[in-house]
């Protein structure tokens, strides 16, 4: 059941389900932009028997799509910490989809390895920002281009792997986000790549190394796998898994497989 809490002056919707087995951390599920916590509705049932699972919707991403002031990774991080403190979550592993990964890494940096011992990210572009994606996130910030940019991104994210549950999520559960949210997403994403170079560059700047895993289906190129192998060669705390999915939405498309990856990764330390 979805609950609501006002934190830092904004509405935050969340679900808090299950109880972690002895010695296991909670799992905190973070979405990308333009999704609310229902993105994880197919994954949570596979995790809740073993873990306490907290899923939240970012500010401005509640069911009413409440308009709020400007915000970015800093505010998303602060809201997440405030929620976890309020509901008594101490040690946890962030599980982040796409550009929610920037928040997961910021949480790790701010809270330290004792509270955030591991991070799992799904389907985030690990290279420097590709030119076509850079053009798309710039177009998201233009009133006359944002809808076409969003449509183009959605087409690439689906890659022909349309299913009824995924269509329901994209067309019904994810509707209602207007130019305000999509333009902000473009700016925040662009700013993150400009600041850090890439998510891997951000990982290298963490104050304390800890195990980080990236699981992904896109893009389907050998050079992308080689990038991950090379990064692990420099940083043994990093690992990756390529998934057999077709879309950019693994928690929706492959919930059982993602749950297996999460359990294996978290249980390495327990």
From Swiss-Prot:
User: What do we know about what induces or represses this protein's expression?
Assistant: Up-regulated by PQS.
List the EC numbers from the record.
Answer: 1.13.11.-
Kindly indicate where the leader peptide sits in this chain: none
Please tell me where substrate binds in this chain: 99
Any one GO MF term held by the record is: dioxygenase activity
AB hydrolase-1 domain segment(s): 25-156
Question: Any idea which residues are catalytic in this one?
Answer: 248 (proton donor/acceptor)
User: Could you tell me which SUPFAM superfamilies the record lists for this protein?
Assistant: alpha/beta-Hydrolases (SSF53474)
Please tell me whether the keyword Oxidoreductase is annotated for this protein.
yes
Q: Which keywords are on file for this protein?
A: Dioxygenase, Oxidoreductase, Plasmid
Question: What's the catalysed reaction?
Answer: 2-heptyl-3-hydroxy-4(1H)-quinolone + O2 = N-octanoylanthranilate + CO + H(+)
Which EC class heads this enzyme's classification? oxidoreductase
Q: List the InterPro entries hit by this protein, alphabetically.
A: AB_hydrolase_1 (IPR000073), AB_hydrolase_fold (IPR029058)
Family per UniProt? Belongs to the AB hydrolase superfamily.
Purpose: Involved in the degradation of the Pseudomonas aeruginosa quorum sensing signal molecules HHQ (2-heptyl-4-quinolone) and PQS (2-heptyl-3-hydroxy-4-quinolone) to anthranilic acid. Catalyzes the cleavage of PQS to form N-octanoylanthranilic acid and carbon monoxide.
Q: What is this protein called?
A: 2-heptyl-3-hydroxy-4-quinolone dioxygenase AqdC2
Q: Which gene encodes it?
A: aqdC2
